[in-house]
């Protein structure tokens, strides 16, 4: 019944973000209180502030690590490359969402756009940290899918001419867990 969170509530939400939590939710009494919209806005502000204070340390995450899966290796390569290039976005064309999940486990300020043809995958991806899921039309042709992805990013104002982004996909297309390609693109 209070429009302003307590210091403890702010601390709990901020620490959850700093601990790498994918999602935060309201308790029943907060969600049903007198100020539900204000509470959500405040939580967004707290989460955003906590995320921007974090320092990206991908070198520490990857140093001495061996990845057993090809899709995981490609996901980590996309994160590392995008971070060091100052890429505007990372795009994962994904059936199951596993590539985006691998990426979301590491702190990076570059937004991750997970493009999927499956509504169930899009819904699951909505809970992953720093992942913005987009539903797209199905395409069996890799080049067509890559062009569609860039068109989606441009249409939404995510990238513009001259921006660099990283994109991952599998060849052949449509195989869950089959991500085996990383491409660095410059928007023309």
List the predicted regions and their residue ranges.
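Conserved, mostly hydrophobic/aromatic
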Residues: 16, 103, 165
